[in-house]
Amino acid sequence: MKTISYLFCACIWVVGLSACQGEQQHAQSEISRQEAVVENGGDPETVNTLVQQYLAYTTNYPEDSEANPRYLYRAAALQYRLNNYDAARNNLEKAIREYYDNENTPNSVLLLEDIYQDKLKDRMASSIIMQAAAESFPELANHQEKVASIQNSGLAPVAQRLDAVARAMYPDTTGRIDLRRANDFITGASVYALISPDGDQVPELLYKAAETARTVQAFTKTIELYDWLIDHYPDFEKVPQAMFLKGFTLDNDLRRLEEARAIYEDFLATYPQDDFADDARFLLDNLGKTDEEIIQSFDGTQAEQ
């Protein structure tokens, strides 16, 4: 009887796997069909349909490390053609970050640099991308004049350039942050970490970029940077603080209380002896309460004593 049950379950698994593979192959066939339409001169609506097919595939089959970076690159190239540069940038960054070891990554890097240089007019980010590409993809210097020329440009190393920007963010004695320089630092640190993820200074730069994003109240970017640090550099010494501050940002600034609760609980389970543990317990106990409610709870505790 057990043998029959095992064989039945095995058959179910094989049928399910075959169905999934069939769906995936069908999705690829539909993409190929739409690519042929676009190659024959599709209008913007037709092009956008193909973009959505690419993105749907990468969402539905994230484990396909061969097709996904190629599809993300093609989606970005089409969005570039449609003048949708922010979306193109986002898809290129996703392709590089999630599929860094893919052979198409250098192409994504070069198109990303083109967007920052020619379309977004962010020359600092563009030059940092080229410096990082020269570090991480030295083979590009043999084929790309931009990459080769950046090596002889006389620019200081990226970490030094970003340190200079960080020191210039507070130009006067008022303590007010220079928003343009803050944005330069956040973007510069992000693209450097993206292109040269193994750089010695990358974890510290991401941490400082997250702090800067929080200072200028770019809270969604703050969470993104903390997640990047926590997920990719778990052994970095400031990861506990990053996890706590992620929870605090979700709690205090974004009011996403259930997400904050999960982060505080994870922080306390992982780092119960951390310097921020008492703060996390207090914030968890008082999650969602107003200042008045917290004061009243103090008064009630004192009265009981």
Question: Model-found features: residue ranges?
Answer:
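Acidic, polar-rich low-complexity tracts and alpha-helical solenoid repeat scaffolds
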Residues: C20-Q305
